[in-house]
């Protein structure tokens, strides 16, 4: 049993090291919402808890959970990396998603300081906490 577990762990790390570069955004749902009355759409102000990791090493580089405050941004207005604008779109409050973001939709060839190297593919574990939508006046 220990041998099988050890072999599985080794195989996991080998696959991570030799994994090909991502060419497109890959989104996986990790937590279904209990009820979905509203889905995040362009122009909504969303609040998202997240943990960000480098895909190659699995190293965590940032987490809103450590600060106890989710990030808040206007969806679809380039206030965050493109992979987030695309990956959060259509989420429901309480939904969890894993975003596998290619470098082109992340920080690209410039990276992000000493935290994210150039051309790094990223993985974000996300949970949509809130959606604020501007009310539409139905009365004319």
Swiss-Prot record:
One Gene Ontology biological process: chaperone-mediated protein folding
Cellular-component GO terms for this entry: endoplasmic reticulum
Span of the signal peptide: 1-19
Alphabetical keyword list: Endoplasmic reticulum, Isomerase, Rotamase, Signal
Matching InterPro entries: FKBP2/11, PPIase_dom_sf, PPIase_FKBP_dom
PANTHER family, sorted: PEPTIDYLPROLYL ISOMERASE (PTHR45779:SF7)
Protein name (record): FK506-binding protein 2
Activity regulation, per record: Inhibited by both FK506 and rapamycin.
NADP among keywords: no
Single GO term (MF): peptidyl-prolyl cis-trans isomerase activity
Domain PPIase FKBP-type, chain residue ranges per copy: 43-132
EC class: isomerase
Catalytic activity reported: [protein]-peptidylproline (omega=180) = [protein]-peptidylproline (omega=0)
Main location: endoplasmic reticulum
UniProt record similarity statement: Belongs to the FKBP-type PPIase family. FKBP2 subfamily.
EC number: 5.2.1.8
Species of provenance: Kluyveromyces lactis (strain ATCC 8585 / CBS 2359 / DSM 70799 / NBRC 1267 / NRRL Y-1140 / WM37) (Yeast)
Compartments where located: Endoplasmic reticulum
Pfam families: FKBP_C
Entries under Gene3D superfamilies matching the protein: 3.10.50.40
């Amino acid at each position: 049993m220990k041998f099988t577990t050890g072999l599985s762990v080794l195989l996991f790390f080998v696959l991570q090291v030799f994994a090909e570069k991502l060419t497109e955004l890959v989104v996986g749902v990790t937590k279904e919402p209990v009820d979905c009355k509203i889905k995040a759409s362009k122009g909504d102000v969303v609040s998202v808890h997240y943990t960000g990791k480098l895909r190659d090493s699995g190293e965590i580089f940032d987490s809103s959970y450590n600060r106890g405050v989710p990030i808040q941004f206007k969806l679809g207005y380039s206030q965050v990396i493109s992979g987030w604008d695309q990956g959060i779109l259509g989420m429901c409050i309480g939904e969890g998603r894993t975003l596998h973001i290619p470098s082109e939709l992340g920080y690209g060839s410039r990276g992000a300081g000493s935290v994210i190297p150039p051309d790094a593919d990223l993985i974000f574990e996300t949970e949509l906490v809130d959606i604020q939508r501007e009310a539409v006046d139905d009365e004319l």
